[in-house]
Amino acid sequence: MEFSAKQIAAFIQGEIIGDENATVHTFAKIEEGMPGAISFLSNPKYTPYIYETQSSIVLVNKDFVPEHEIRATLIKVDNAYESLAKLLNLYEMSKPKKQGIDSLAYIAPSAKIGENVYIGAFAYIGENAVIGDNTQIYPHTFVGDGVKIGNGCLLYSNVNVYHDCRIGNECILHSGAVIGADGFGFAPTPNGYDKIPQIGIVILEDKVDIGANTCVDRATMGATIIHSGAKIDNLVQIAHNDEIGSHTVMAAQVGIAGSAKIGEWCMFGGQVGIAGHITIGDRVNLGAQSGIPSSIKADSVLIGTPPMEPKAYFKAAVVTKNLPDMQKEIRNLRKEVEELKQLLNK
């Protein structure tokens, strides 16, 4: 499909600087631009590329002021990254979607399948499962007994949704995601550990994204809940009875122990670890590799283990980097003190 700058500007409510008849048919990073491509500039680090990019159209923020002549047609918008997302979504929606049920898929007689559903080869749909309209289930995906999946969902190959779990509308589950495996619950005894049956479920509300090889464990009792709009990256572990607030985002390798409550609009960097049975307030930002042993109030910005404010953390990091030199200096000072003591004692 081909679009002109005029059509794109109308769709994203932007201002054209240049040729309104410039056309594009593909997307490209600004540093890899080519004729017929649309790119974007939102990170100032990439500003030098805008003067040499071969892209036909570039989305920029309204406050961008060129320092040199630019070959490309510019479209100025409030938020270039957000506008790019709108265009990419339009591009995705224009692609033809798979439909129909492959003859090699297994669907239990009691399962209920909505309209315009795609179920790929060797997918398994269990007894009393419900699949909503326009949902796509790719090959080799397992949907257990009693599972309910809403409308417009996308489950890529090798997703596993255990029995009785619930998935809302427009959720995306990437390959290898496991929803509803047993929580890590064991009772210590003199002879070892007795397994505690995990009889709860997992609930994913609307527009939740789950990354590849991420696990969301079922509750011991009740439900592990991920609220609407939350986005979870690859290789994340969410334990039994956790509750993740709406629109919270977590980068890869975050680990959350059981019964933690995470607020809305939080942002966790990669490899953050959260202790169990604590509460993280709304809009908390945690830097990568932070270890969180206790509850945190809303609107906090922390990094490190133990967690501290970024300014204090980076000061401590400088001190840590200089520890070998400081140790050497202290040893020399101790040696000098001992020599002075010996002189004074003579």
Curated annotation (Swiss-Prot):
Superkingdom, natural source: Bacteria
Any one GO BP annotation for this protein: lipid A biosynthetic process
Intrachain S-S bonds: none
GO molecular function: N-acyltransferase activity
GO cellular component: membrane
PANTHER family hit by this protein: UDP-3-O-ACYLGLUCOSAMINE N-ACYLTRANSFERASE, UDP-3-O-ACYLGLUCOSAMINE N-ACYLTRANSFERASE 1, MITOCHONDRIAL-RELATED
Protein's UniProt name: UDP-3-O-acylglucosamine N-acyltransferase
Organism: Bacteroides thetaiotaomicron (strain ATCC 29148 / DSM 2079 / JCM 5827 / CCUG 10774 / NCTC 10582 / VPI-5482 / E50)
